[in-house]
């Protein structure tokens, strides 16, 4: 099965072509300050040309549904739903926090991916490996990073994600020596991971929606002033 996956939920844009039989075929990842609407279709076209495939070769489409950038999520979901609809192929929507956590196989401590939500806030959840399988231990959440970590000070935890990179000093202040940080490349979301997770998942094209988890900053400001 050939899977085309896309991730546009953060500043990083990524597209990957993945075979369920042989693994990753090709991947394009861009961490540049351009809107995903400008480059995601270009990345998909280039990826297909470089790997000598066409869109009709794809058996399944997969996409990050968030949380993260509201605009980025909307773009990615719209693009992949459009491709799945036009080709009549299956679709899968994968949570961004699951994607980031899945990118490491750290087994001797818990894993907390943090996606930046600005102003020392983040999207987060907590994971650990049980019998070789990654298991989510918390609900997906959003809020003050300090408040979320307050009752976790005594645990050894591996942090990753753009929020962990941005607020590394804050996390160190809270956690002390119990905080470990993944190398920077593991904190970048990768579409190839989305593709791998999506192998055993299938969603309804017409009901698949973005997973925002919180209201956009503009909406929060409007409510605050009301």
Feature map (PLM): residue ranges:
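N-terminal beta-alpha supersecondary unit
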Residues: 1-65
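Surface "functional belts" at beta-alpha junctions
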Residues: 32-35, 90-187, 212, 217
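A general structural signal for well-ordered alpha-helical segments in protein cores
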Residues: 37, 41, 80, 97, ...
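Stable alpha-helical structural segments in soluble proteins, enriched in small hydrophobic residues
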Residues: 47-51, 86, 104, 194-201
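DPxDG-like acidic metal-binding loop motif
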Residues: 62-96
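Acyltransferase
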Residues: 180-226
């Amino acid at each position: 099965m050939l899977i085309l996956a896309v991730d546009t939920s953060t500043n990083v844009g990524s597209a990957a072509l993945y075979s369920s039989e042989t693994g990753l075929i090709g991947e394009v990842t861009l961490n540049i300050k351009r809107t995903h609407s400008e480059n995601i279709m270009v990345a998909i076209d280039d990826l297909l040309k470089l790997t000598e495939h066409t869109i009709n070769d794809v058996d399944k489409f997969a996409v990050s549904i968030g949380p993260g950038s509201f605009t980025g999520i909307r773009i990615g979901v719209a693009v992949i739903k459009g491709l799945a609809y036009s080709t009549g192929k299956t679709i899968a929507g994968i949570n961004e926090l699951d994607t980031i956590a899945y990118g490491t196989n750290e087994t001797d401590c818990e894993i907390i991916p943090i996606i930046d939500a600005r102003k020392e806030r983040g999207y987060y959840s907590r994971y650990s490996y049980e019998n070789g399988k990654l298991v989510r231990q918390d609900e997906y959440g959003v809020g003050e990073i300090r408040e979320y970590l307050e009752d976790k000070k005594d645990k050894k935890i591996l942090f990753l994600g753009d929020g962990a990179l941005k607020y590394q000093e804050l996390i160190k202040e809270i956690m002390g020596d119990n905080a470990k940080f993944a190398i920077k490349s593991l904190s970048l979301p990768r579409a190839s991971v989305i593709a791998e997770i999506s192998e055993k998942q299938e969603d309804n094209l017409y009901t698949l929606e973005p997973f925002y988890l919180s209201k956009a900053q503009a909406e929060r400001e409007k409510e605050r002033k009301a």
